[in-house]
């Protein structure tokens, strides 16, 4: 027995020595370090908001609380002698898990001594090409009898699988779909090419679907599209998008949501998101700017009580839109909801040649209800907000306006106003300069009709060349409409020029303008 012990102990000592001499060494905290290289899926992290006085040793002590650290590289300003820390670094853990745990514990959570802001920790730019969302696949139309192991076996031939998960319903049963994450995007792409619609599994009505899983941005777009679709269905049930009075339910939140979805879709080029929203078909990226003006104007009108009161007493041409079939004379007795008016313009955008002039017509609901007392008791703030909202509109399409108004009304005004030089009361006559060369009397009338009843619109023509002098006069039947037109149209850009709109001077002055 003793001989056995003597023979055995040296072997134990040799084994113990060999363990200590192996590449695996002990860390300061007592846990075993990793040999040589980090794991294949390890992440290089960028860390900001660290003290400039901290060295690699200080940073290592901070990060090793979350796992073994392979490498730390402090970024330094080489123009100084000696080079000084820039207050940021790169850190690579041996495992992906340790890096994510450190990020969860430190990012925007911990403020280091001497710093005013919390640590910023995120994957380095070089890691973005290997983001999880670029390697994760959605597998649909799989048998509900499949287990995670079955899915792993099915896809393991395409590369190393980092994660495999069956999606379960609230009833505890499989939803017939799964998520599979590979270690590289190339592996995921190979799996898509080989497996998408390659087979129809038991209990499934169509072939297997294999595609990249939706990113958070994709999910957000789908959610917004669903909300918009529900809004449109509700409105459609009440008015079939034909009776504009049914648009009373539209608020600025809806318009802002509409704008946000369009902006994201236009920037991403993913027009499929809007395929189910048929009333939106007439809008394009050039009209997003105008829709933003509508949303801002709607919000301003709703948030200004005095402005809303003025809007509800409107007798402007826009009231014709909300009372289908009514005559101009009867339209003044109809109450116009400001949000419905703006919503009506947004709805008609798809039917117009351009939304720019149409969006200006939204002003009319305000202008018609503003009297001199209205301008002095605070409703002018709403007018200012609306003017600012429309200040960004850069394009102009005169052909759009006739589609927004009752054609009979337009014809009646055209007969009496276009080309005539009849003047309105004092303060209701405008001088317009920098008109496009091709603009005629009818174009001038159409451009200024949204702000009130135009009694005359005249573009001056050079008698020798028979060409426009690029200026003209517009007269309203009241000074309030003239002021509204000045606020909205002065500085309005058409092509390469900006309109100059001001009050026509009195006959007693030496110059008419």
UniProtKB/Swiss-Prot annotation:
GO terms for molecular function: RNA binding. Residues 304-336 are annotated as: Disordered. It is found in: Nucleus; Cytoplasm. This is CUGBP Elav-like family member 1. The keyword DNA repair does not apply. It comes from the Eukaryota. The modification Phosphoserine is found at residues 206, 329. The keyword Amino-acid biosynthesis does not apply. RRM1 and RRM2 domains preferentially target UGU(U/G)-rich mRNA elements. Associates with polysomes. Interacts with HNRNPH1; the interaction in RNA-dependent. Interacts with PARN. Component of an EIF2 complex at least composed of CELF1/CUGBP1, CALR, CALR3, EIF2S1, EIF2S2, HSP90B1 and HSPA5. Coiled coil: none annotated. One of its GO terms (cellular component) is cytoplasm. Residues 311-336 have a biased composition (Low complexity). Belongs to the CELF/BRUNOL family. Disulfide bonds: none annotated. The modification Phosphothreonine is found at residue 31. Keywords: Activator, Cytoplasm, Isopeptide bond, mRNA processing, mRNA splicing, Nucleus, Phosphoprotein, Repeat, RNA-binding, Ubl conjugation. RNA-binding protein implicated in the regulation of several post-transcriptional events. Involved in pre-mRNA alternative splicing, mRNA translation and stability. Mediates exon inclusion and/or exclusion in pre-mRNA that are subject to tissue-specific and developmentally regulated alternative splicing. Specifically activates exon 5 inclusion of cardiac isoforms of TNNT2 during heart remodeling at the juvenile to adult transition. It comes from Pongo abelii (Sumatran orangutan). It holds the Pfam family RRM_1. Gene3D superfamilies: 3.30.70.330. GO terms for biological process: mRNA processing; regulation of RNA splicing; RNA splicing.
């Amino acid at each position: 027995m003793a001989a056995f012990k003597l023979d055995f102990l040296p072997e134990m000592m040799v084994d113990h020595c060999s363990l200590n001499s192996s590449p695996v060494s002990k860390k300061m905290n007592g846990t075993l370090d990793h040999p040589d290289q980090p794991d294949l899926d390890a992440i290089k992290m960028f860390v900001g908001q660290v003290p400039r006085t901290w060295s690699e040793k200080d940073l290592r002590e901070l990060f090793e609380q979350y796992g073994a650290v392979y490498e730390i590289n402090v970024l330094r300003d080489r123009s100084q002698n000696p080079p000084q820390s820039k207050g940021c670094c790169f850190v690579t853990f041996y495992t992906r898990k340790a890096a994510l745990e450190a990020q969860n514990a430190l990012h925007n959570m911990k403020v280091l001594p001497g710093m005013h802001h919390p640590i910023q920790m995120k994957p380095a730019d070089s890691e973005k090409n290997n983001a999880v969302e670029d390697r994760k696949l959605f597998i649909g139309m799989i048998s509900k009898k499949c287990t995670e192991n079955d899915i792993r076996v099915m896809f393991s031939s395409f590369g190393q699988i980092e994660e495999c998960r069956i999606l379960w319903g609230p009833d505890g049963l499989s939803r017939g779909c799964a998520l599979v994450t590979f270690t590289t995007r190339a592996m995921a792409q190979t799996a898509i090419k080989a497996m998408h619609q390659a087979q129809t599994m038991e209990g499934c009505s169509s072939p297997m679907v294999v595609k990249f899983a939706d990113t958070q941005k994709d999910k957000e777009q789908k959610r917004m599209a669903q909300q918009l679709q529900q809004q449109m269905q509700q409105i459609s049930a009440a008015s079939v998008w034909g009776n504009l009075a049914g648009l009373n339910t539209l608020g600025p939140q809806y318009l802002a949501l509409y704008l946000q979805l369009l902006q994201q879709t236009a920037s991403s080029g993913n027009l499929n998101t809007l395929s189910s929203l048929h009333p939106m078909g007439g809008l394009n990226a050039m009209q997003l700017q105008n829709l933003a003006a509508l949303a801002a104007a709607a919000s301003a009108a709703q948030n200004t009580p005095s402005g809303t009161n003025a809007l509800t007493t409107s007798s402007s041409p826009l009231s014709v839109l909300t009372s289908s079939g009514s005559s101009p004379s009867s339209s003044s007795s109809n109450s116009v909801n400001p949000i419905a008016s703006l919503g009506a313009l947004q709805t008609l955008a798809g039917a117009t040649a351009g939304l720019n002039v149409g969006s200006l017509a939204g002003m009319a609901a305000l202008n018609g209800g503003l009297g001199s007392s209205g301008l002095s008791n605070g409703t002018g703030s709403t007018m200012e907000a609306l003017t600012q909202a429309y200040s960004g509109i850069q394009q102009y399409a005169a052909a759009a306006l006739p589609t927004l108004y009752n054609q009979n009304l337009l014809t009646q005004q055209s007969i009496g106003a276009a080309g005539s030089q009849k003047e309105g009361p004092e303060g209701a006559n405008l001088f317009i300069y920098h008109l496009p060369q091709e603009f005629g009397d009818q174009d001038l009338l159409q451009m200024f009709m949204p702000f009130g009843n135009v009694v005359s619109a005249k573009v001056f023509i050079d008698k020798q060349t028979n060409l426009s002098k690029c200026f003209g006069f517009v007269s309203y039947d009241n000074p309030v409409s003239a002021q509204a037109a000045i606020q909205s149209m002065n500085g309005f850009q058409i092509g390469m020029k900006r309109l100059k709109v001001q009050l026509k001077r009195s006959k007693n002055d030496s110059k008419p303008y």
